[in-house]
Design a protein with these regions (language model features):
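Basic amphipathic alpha-helical segments that dock to polyanions
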Residues: 48-55
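Amphipathic alpha-helical dimerization/coiled-coil segments
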Residues: 85-112
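Beta-hairpin "wing" of winged helix-turn-helix
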Residues: 58-73
Length: 112
């Protein structure tokens, strides 16, 4: 059976890649840190969770609640995992970028 894979927005790609990099440690705080460290962008919790909820509805990620912890006032962490459809969506986006970059000569930009 073929998996229906929706097109990804740029931030959705970033979030999926952060989850894949973090593995079983992917929850809100660690994802925001990973995105910040890798992209120099600091997404707000609202932007991140809105995107995660939308991607869960699309079937790109699934979430589960961990155990409540005293450090979080008895609240549980919500962990995320990329589904097969999410992996395929990332792969499709990466293929599209490679195709667009093929043969393109980008100017060298010096970083200050």
């Amino acid at each position: 059976m073929r998996i229906r894979v929706p097109a990804l927005g740029e931030f959705e790609q970033v979030v999926l890649l952060a989850i894949l990099r973090l593995g079983d440690r992917a929850y809100g705080v660690t994802m925001r840190e990973e995105i910040r460290d890798c992209t120099n962008r600091e997404p707000t919790p609202g932007a991140l969770y809105t995107t995660l909820d939308r991607m869960e509805e699309k079937g790109l990620v699934r979430s589960r609640l961990g155990d409540p912890t005293p450090q979080r006032g008895g609240r549980a962490k919500r962990f995320f995992q990329v589904t097969a459809a999410g992996v395929e969506a990332v792969a499709r986006a990466q293929r599209a970028y490679r195709q667009l970059l093929r043969g393109l000569k980008l100017p060298v930009v010096a970083h200050a």
